[in-house]
């Protein structure tokens, strides 16, 4: 009799994806972030579901309902902070996952990479809409500023913004539709993640060397299941420490003030994980130019396979590219810092230089470094 996990139609899929999957024997801890993202998504869907049971998407009661969750619902405060800080952990894992893909050349798996970029976009949209729901000052003004960017689109811009708002300003209709979208999108993310995995399992995983590992595979279980469990324990430990000891560390104090359309906060800024893109947006004086730069800052990832000039897939044996990669990381950290600063000297010029550096590194310097390294191989 054959084993049930190899014969049952559903178990067979699970078996081929998580148990008998042939995996490279040398993948490092940088390959843990895929499973961690899955755990983050499940955690966000569960905590979000329990929050939605008590939340009301009406401008008059939204802020009060969040206060009610934190004060009156059994363990409501922990559910709320798990959800808010879970989003931060989600984005930390996302950035590490994308960074790993860039460093080790995983973007040569075209379908997997492109679906990954779509996943990044959808996740960012979901997080943005979720940030609007508590209806604090930063929720309201963040929604106003970001949706208003669409008015930069020629001819149809203003109509588009009013269509998204459901009126002439961010109001009840906006909040209700954002809640509806924020509820449905995580399930779309889950579906896309399955397609992402489907395409990945067509080719098999990449590995740190960037060389085919067909000659040296090991089963996913028990080797990588135990490794993923260790990663999950560390993720939950960090999240628990954050939730229990510093729940508001990554939040904005302005969001503890109910939304007031008549009073603009001194510094409007998004959550920390959007600050790098926000800094790029602000560094261009022209509205439409800023919006295009903002979109391109993420969309540029789709160009990565076309910008790959090296004969080697991974950066493991490419010291010049390695240096440029870490300069890019430093540049993104600089942009994140600038995004949270007021628009004044010297922050404006630092932001502009960091934005130019970001596009220059990806579009020019890294492809040139790849070509130089190819020539150095001939020596």
Curated annotation (Swiss-Prot):
One of its GO terms (molecular function) is ubiquinol-cytochrome-c reductase activity. It is found in: Mitochondrion inner membrane. Component of the ubiquinol-cytochrome c reductase complex (complex III or cytochrome b-c1 complex) that is part of the mitochondrial respiratory chain. The b-c1 complex mediates electron transfer from ubiquinol to cytochrome c. Contributes to the generation of a proton gradient across the mitochondrial membrane that is then used for ATP synthesis. This is Cytochrome b. One of its GO terms (biological process) is mitochondrial electron transport, ubiquinol to cytochrome c. Heme b b566 binds at residues 97, 196. It comes from Neotragus moschatus (Suni). Its main location: mitochondrion. The chain crosses the membrane at residues 33-53, 77-98, 113-133, 178-198, 226-246, 288-308, 320-340, 347-367. It holds the Pfam family Cytochrome_B. Heme 1 (or BL or b562) is low-potential and absorbs at about 562 nm, and heme 2 (or BH or b566) is high-potential and absorbs at about 566 nm. Binds 2 heme b groups non-covalently. CDD domains: cytochrome_b_C, Cytochrome_b_N. It is a multi-pass membrane protein.
């Amino acid at each position: 009799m054959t084993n049930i996990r190899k014969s049952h139609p559903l178990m067979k899929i699970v078996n081929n994806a998580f148990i008998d999957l042939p995996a490279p024997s040398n993948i490092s801890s940088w390959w843990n972030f895929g499973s961690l993202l899955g755990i983050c998504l499940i955690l966000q869907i569960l905590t979000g579901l329990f929050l939605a049971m008590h939340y009301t998407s009406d401008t008059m009661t939204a802020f009060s309902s969040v206060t009610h969750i934190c004060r009156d619902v059994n363990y409501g405060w922990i559910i709320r902070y798990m959800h808010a800080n879970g989003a931060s952990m989600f984005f930390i894992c996302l950035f590490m996952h994308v960074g790993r893909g860039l460093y080790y050349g995983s973007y040569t798996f075209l379908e997997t990479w492109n679906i990954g970029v779509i996943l990044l976009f959808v996740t960012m949209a979901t997080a943005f809409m979720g940030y609007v729901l508590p209806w604090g000052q930063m929720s309201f003004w963040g929604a106003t500023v970001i949706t208003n960017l669409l008015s930069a689109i020629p001819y149809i811009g203003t109509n588009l913004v009013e269509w998204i708002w459901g009126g002439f300003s961010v109001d009840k209709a906006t909040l209700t539709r954002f809640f509806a979208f924020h509820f449905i999108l995580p399930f779309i993310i889950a579906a896309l993640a399955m397609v992402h995995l489907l395409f990945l399992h067509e080719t098999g995983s990449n590995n740190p060397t960037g060389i085919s590992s067909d000659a040296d595979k090991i089963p996913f279980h028990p080797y990588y299941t135990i490794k993923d469990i260790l990663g999950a324990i560390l993720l939950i430990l960090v999240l628990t420490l954050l939730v229990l000891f510093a729940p508001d560390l990554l939040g904005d104090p302005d969001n503890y003030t109910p939304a007031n359309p008549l009073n603009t906060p001194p510094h409007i800024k998004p959550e920390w994980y959007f600050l790098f893109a926000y800094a790029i947006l602000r560094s261009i004086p022209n509205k439409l130019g800023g919006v295009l730069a903002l979109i391109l800052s993420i969309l540029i990832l789709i160009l990565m396979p076309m910008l790959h000039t090296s004969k080697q897939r991974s950066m493991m044996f490419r010291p010049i590219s390695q240096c440029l990669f870490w300069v890019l990381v430093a540049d993104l950290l600089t942009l994140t810092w600038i995004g949270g600063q007021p628009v004044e000297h010297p922050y404006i010029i630092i932001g502009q230089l960091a934005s130019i550096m970001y596009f220059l590194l990806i579009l020019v310097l890294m492809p040139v470094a790849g070509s130089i390294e190819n020539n150095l191989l001939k020596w």
